[in-house]
Amino acid sequence: MSWPATHDELEALGRELVAGGLGPFGGYEVAFGELSLTGPAHRIVEGLTLLRDDHGFQQLVDICGVDYPERERRFDVVYHLLSFTKNRRIRVKVQADEDTAVPSVTGVYPNADWYEREAFDMYGVFFDGHPDLRRILTDYGFHGHPLRKDFPMTGYVEVRYDDELKRVVYEPVKSVEWRNWDFLSPWEGVERGFAPILPGDEKGEEAKS
């Protein structure tokens, strides 16, 4: 296949890799000049090995997650691969839930080590066979997984350095009390030849009349 590949060539590669659903991939999509593959999570090691050894995708660029809370298997685990020789990228997606571990691909791409730790830290996705699956971005004892859709925007605790105690302290988040903000601008409507009457302007209007 010539690279960069045309849409039809990517379609042909997708059909070849899916192979009637008998291989490690169950579906494919071509969009924006890139091929995305989907498959069962338990065959991800087989699938990535095939792409590395038979199709020249030597580099794992990233592993990321997507959260769909309304889905039974709420997470997509997305693997981004790069071929140096063909100058092309390919994407592989598998689905996972909160209880079922995805096989680790550190045996295929050793740099998956930290990527899988990040996915575990941010989404709570477990990777079976990972050599050291622990948090990598959040602090020790952190509660929850920040990139889940149901994680609160403010988090659960505030972490700061207390200069008096000379140590890091954890405190419950102190949210701002609800307020009825007035966003009305006195300049709104000026370009149309009038301006709104703001609270407190009533006396001025009465004096004019």
Curated annotation (Swiss-Prot):
How is this protein annotated for GO cellular component?
plasma membrane
Q: Which PROSITE patterns match?
A: COMPLEX1_30K (PS00542)
Write out the entry's keywords from A to Z: Cell inner membrane, Cell membrane, Membrane, NAD, Quinone, Translocase, Transport, Ubiquinone
Output the SUPFAM superfamilies linked to this UniProt entry. Answer: Nqo5-like
Q: Which InterPro entries match?
A: NADH_DH_suC, NADH_quin_OxRdtase_su_C/D-like, NADH_UbQ_OxRdtase_30kDa_su, NADH_UbQ_OxRdtase_CS
Spell out the molecular function terms from Gene Ontology. Answer: NADH dehydrogenase (ubiquinone) activity; NADH:ubiquinone reductase (non-electrogenic) activity; quinone binding
Catalytic activity, reaction form: a quinone + NADH + 5 H(+)(in) = a quinol + NAD(+) + 4 H(+)(out)
What is the annotated localization of this protein? Answer: Cell inner membrane
Q: How does the record say this protein sits in the membrane?
A: Peripheral membrane protein
Q: Name one Pfam family in it.
A: Complex1_30kDa
**Entry's EC annotation:** 7.1.1.-
Q: What class of enzyme is it?
A: translocase
Highest taxon in the source lineage:
Bacteria
Job description of the protein: NDH-1 shuttles electrons from NADH, via FMN and iron-sulfur (Fe-S) centers, to quinones in the respiratory chain. The immediate electron acceptor for the enzyme in this species is believed to be ubiquinone. Couples the redox reaction to proton translocation (for every two electrons transferred, four hydrogen ions are translocated across the cytoplasmic membrane), and thus conserves the redox energy in a proton gradient.
Oligomeric form and interacting partners? NDH-1 is composed of 14 different subunits. Subunits NuoB, C, D, E, F, and G constitute the peripheral sector of the complex.
According to its UniProt record, which protein family does this protein belong to? Belongs to the complex I 30 kDa subunit family.
Please identify the protein, giving its name as recorded. Answer: NADH-quinone oxidoreductase subunit C
Question: Which organism does this sequence originate in?
Answer: Phenylobacterium zucineum (strain HLK1)
Instruction: Point out the gene that encodes the protein.
Output: nuoC
